[in-house]
């Protein structure tokens, strides 16, 4: 099992630094696998966890495909040159469900916070220092690549409720409204939330550039590139395109991209 673990986690030439970090990752890797999976599955070590990943909340559940391989999911590894991976710390905070559809890599310094349903299909790769906050549902299709310093969040975290006031009287008077004017129109309106969580759906073979923000309600179709620094909060259609700008629009059509 030890040799399988070392070979699977590094298919390239291993430096002394890499080897040392892999050995240090064994305790957290064992803890993660034994917590989430049956013993037979856990002993295959399908998920490897860097010692620099803070396992803040090991609740909820983690789902794997039927065919399980050693180190098919890597959390907290990689080496993006403009970050210091020696001090780059990730966080795993899960009380919901995380589903891995195959091989996946969550790079060093990345934060995963899930109380809803997060689905990462085969070939998912998040390079470094990015954050996923899932309160409802976030889905990534096959072969998705996320660059560094990205935020994916399907919630506003804090609820906002409707508060009806007599705006007509306030505008006309030009004075500070009295408490009677500001009172809600009804208890039903007072309890109506106006910012519910909304799912984020990302298709197959999507590349999200660095410093992008994907907020609730985002839908990205297959074979799309999201340009660096773009903020998305709505649904797009079409394929083989580049989306970018603020507000975002389709910048180019009929493109394809490769890793």
What label would you give each PLM region?
Residues 2-153, 159, 169-182, 186-187, ...:
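Domain-scale signature associated with acetyltransferase and cell-envelope carbohydrate enzymes
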Residues 225:
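Cys/His-clustered metal-coordination modules, chiefly Zn-binding fingers
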Residues 232-233:
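Short hydrophobic beta-strand element within catalytic cores of glycosyltransferases
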